[in-house]
């Protein structure tokens, strides 16, 4: 689905749909070239990390990593629980690409999503 912004308000955008598509629930939104100022982790993410710790997973792949802090937010939770889980940073936007060197300093590995970049 592709949208064209036709008006911008303080807390929402008015968009025109450019093609035929159906938007389902629980879908992410990719806005190329725009920095999205949202927290790296949701409450659901935190619960999923705790589940991963309890179930001795080896890796966590964190989507839409933008910077080093996004990885460190997960690492802090893992450290609080003395977990050896490794973090794979999924780079899916330009901000992540721009900060890839600092992300590599703290992540075990990276995955690049060529569809989103």
Question: Where is each model-derived feature located?
Answer:
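Active-site beta-loop-alpha junctions enriched in small/polar residues
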Residues: 18-20, 65, 90-94
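Catalytic cores of alpha/beta
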Residues: 95-105
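Short beta-strand/loop segments at the ligand-binding rim of alpha/beta enzyme cores
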Residues: 31-36, 78-90
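Beta-strand/loop-dominated core regions that host nucleotide or nucleotide-derived cofactor-binding catalytic loops
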Residues: 1-49
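Active-site-adjacent beta->alpha loops and helix N-cap segments on the catalytic face
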Residues: 64-80, 96-98
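Hydrophobic faces of well-ordered beta-strands that scaffold small-molecule active sites
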Residues: 60, 87-91, 110-112
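Conserved small/polar residues in nucleotide/adenosyl-binding loops
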Residues: 115-117
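Conserved, mostly hydrophobic/aromatic
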Residues: 52, 60, 103, 113
């Amino acid at each position: 689905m592709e949208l064209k912004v036709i008006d911008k308000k303080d807390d929402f955008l008015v968009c025109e749909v450019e093609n035929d598509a159906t938007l389902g629930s629980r879908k992410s939104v990719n806005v190329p070239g725009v920095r999205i100022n949202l927290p790296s982790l949701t409450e659901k993410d935190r619960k999923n990390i705790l589940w991963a710790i309890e179930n001795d997973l080896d890796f966590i792949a964190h989507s839409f990593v933008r910077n080093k802090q996004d990885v460190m937010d997960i690492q802090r939770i893992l450290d609080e629980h003395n977990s050896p889980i490794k973090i794979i940073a999924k780079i899916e936007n330009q901000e992540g690409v721009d900060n890839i060197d600092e992300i590599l300093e703290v992540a075990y590995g990276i995955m690049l999503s060529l569809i989103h970049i």
